[in-house]
């Protein structure tokens, strides 16, 4: 068996084209374009790359992009004050603060300061709670994008045994909630999980988000499983690889995401979808 590749780059581009058409229609109807404020604190190289991609994506679909690049010494109070300004700005529908933040700034305070109706990252406790209560509104971008990828396979997820490896607030935990919503029997694995191999071998649907290159051997994959690799790891030679040993895993899985070109583009596409949703549902 050789797995079919789930082309996240192509699916994300389709979404972006659809969003661009919707924004054009809004403008032609005399409505404003959605606005996204992107806040970067410090000069972390990876964060700069991510933020640049998000800003370019906004411009591509016709959103208004507000950029705030703050020095790494910016105080927590100053950052919270900027968020307050964005909260009150009627032209801004979504606020994104790029994580991680400098050590002197408490991330939970920052996340909770963003108004829930402008929390297009889907991290605010209100939005996480809505997902837990099975009435999601603004959803965490990476899990949301992954669900779009899974849907693209045409596989019925009801009753599948799903395993999520990684229990972060950004991916693992909301991912498990998303899978529960689609009828999966969901297991979350983390650094204290015993018999990880046994759990993986039972998975009809496997999502791996641990940030360790080749962490999951390909021969652990259950024949016919769907494999979603969230990891983006750069090796010494510069090559980007995922958390799953791709070549071996592709011999067992029915569908698999590549790295790069799998989950990454979908995270940004979902951010754009959330921003348009916030504009239409909350701020029109």
UniProtKB/Swiss-Prot annotation:
GO terms for cellular component: cytosol. InterPro entries: Aminoacid_DH-like_N_sf (IPR046346), NAD(P)-bd_dom_sf (IPR036291), THF_DH/CycHdrlase (IPR000672), THF_DH/CycHdrlase_cat_dom (IPR020630), THF_DH/CycHdrlase_CS (IPR020867), THF_DH/CycHdrlase_NAD-bd_dom (IPR020631). The keyword Lipid biosynthesis does not apply. It comes from Shewanella halifaxensis (strain HAW-EB4). Homodimer. Keywords: Amino-acid biosynthesis, Histidine biosynthesis, Hydrolase, Methionine biosynthesis, Multifunctional enzyme, NADP, One-carbon metabolism, Oxidoreductase, Purine biosynthesis. This is Bifunctional protein FolD. Transmembrane segments: none annotated. Gene3D superfamilies: Leucine Dehydrogenase, chain A, domain 1, NAD(P)-binding Rossmann-like Domain. Its EC number is 1.5.1.5, 3.5.4.9. It catalyses: (6R)-5,10-methylene-5,6,7,8-tetrahydrofolate + NADP(+) = (6R)-5,10-methenyltetrahydrofolate + NADPH; (6R)-5,10-methenyltetrahydrofolate + H2O = (6R)-10-formyltetrahydrofolate + H(+). It holds the Pfam family THF_DHG_CYH. SUPFAM superfamilies: Aminoacid dehydrogenase-like, N-terminal domain, NAD(P)-binding Rossmann-fold domains.
């Amino acid at each position: 068996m050789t797995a079919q590749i789930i082309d996240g780059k192509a699916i994300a581009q389709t979404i972006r084209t659809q969003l661009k058409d919707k924004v054009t229609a809004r403008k032609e109807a005399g409505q404003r374009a959605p606005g996204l404020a992107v806040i970067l604190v410090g000069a972390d190289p990876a964060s700069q790359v991510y933020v640049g991609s998000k800003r370019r994506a906004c411009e591509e679909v016709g959103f208004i992009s507000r950029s705030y690049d703050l020095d790494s010494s910016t105080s927590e109070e100053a950052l919270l004050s900027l968020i307050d300004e964005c909260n009150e700005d009627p032209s801004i529908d979504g606020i994104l603060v790029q994580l991680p933040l400098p050590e002197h700034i408490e991330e939970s305070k920052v996340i909770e300061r963003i108004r829930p109706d402008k929390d297009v990252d889907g991290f605010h406790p209100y939005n996480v709670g809505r997902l837990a209560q099975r009435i999601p509104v603004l959803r965490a971008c990476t899990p949301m994008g992954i669900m779009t990828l899974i849907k693209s396979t045409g596989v019925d997820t009801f009753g599948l045994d799903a395993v999520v490896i990684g229990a972060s607030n950004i991916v693992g935990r909301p991912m498990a909630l998303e899978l529960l919503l689609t009828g999966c029997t969901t297991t979350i694995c983390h650094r204290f999980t015993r018999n990880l191999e046994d759990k993986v071998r039972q998975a009809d649907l496997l999502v791996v988000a641990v940030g360790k290159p080749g962490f999951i051997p390909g021969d652990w994959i259950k024949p016919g499983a769907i494999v979603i690799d969230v990891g983006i790891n750069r090796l010494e030679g510069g090559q980007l690889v995922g958390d799953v040993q791709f070549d071996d895993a592709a011999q067992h899985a029915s569908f698999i995401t590549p790295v790069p070109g799998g989950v990454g583009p979908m995270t940004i596409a979902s951010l754009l979808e959330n921003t348009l949703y916030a504009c239409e549902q909350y701020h029109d």
